Amino acid sequence: MVEKIESLLTEMEFYCSEKHPAGALLLTGEWGGGKTYFVVNKLQPHLKDSHIFIRISLFGIKSVNELQASIKKKWIECIADYIAMSKIDVGATSKVFNALKPFAKACVDTFIDTSVPEGKQGIAKSLFSISADQLITITNEINGKIIVLVFDDLERSSIPFGELLGCINEYVENQHFHTIIIANENTIKKRENEHSGASETLKYNEIKEKVVERQLEFHNDPLEI
């Protein structure tokens, strides 16, 4: 089992390090199997020096607009946290600001001395004081670190799968984000068959093929987590 987990970690690390991924990575497995735990507590720490992971739970999200707003909010939270918690000097902080254009100037205008902890707290506060919808275009890299979007609970979203996967594909294909989708695919197919018939399941599979570059099955021994 350890070998399987290590192999899975290697495959996911390879995907996250691809220069130009052709699609998303789908990690599927049964509920309670440890998929999210694996990504958050194994993969993320393993790549902490080169990647920033942004996890968005799709549970309870009812529209594409709500999802897009949630992604922007999570992006700002992660970047603000990165700036506030990193041991970076003023020069390094300036490089981050350059990457955070066009709202960097609005932040700088409100900052105090950024070389002290209070200044770093000011960075986070300033980021949250800005209207993300109006001023921000999220980027797939920040200060040399690759951003990985993690969409969790695919099967628990209220958004029709066609719209949902189409939205995710926008980040994958057009904005070139490394993207991990965590799902219980058996539940998705069962639900589609029960409520919409086989044609809808086929539709899900067809759309998935356009969005997903590779699919990995997660089978974990509870004793391993």
Give, region by region, the residue ranges found by the protein language model.
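Short, conserved catalytic or adaptor-binding loops enriched in Gly and charged residues
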Residues: 45-47, 204-210
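Short, well-ordered alpha-helical packing segments
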Residues: 13, 43, 68, 72, ...
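Conserved Walker B catalytic segment
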Residues: 133-186, 190, 194-196, 200
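Conserved small helical "lid"/interfacial subdomain of P-loop NTPases
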Residues: 210-225
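Phosphate/oxyanion-binding active-site loops and adjacent basic polyanion-contact surfaces
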Residues: 1-8, 34-35, 63-68, 157-161, ...
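P-loop NTPase nucleotide-binding core
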Residues: 24, 29-30, 36-40, 46-144, ...
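Pre-Walker A adenine-sensing motif
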Residues: 1-22
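Conserved nucleotide-binding/hydrolysis micro-motifs of P-loop NTPases
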Residues: 22, 32-33, 60-63, 184-189, ...
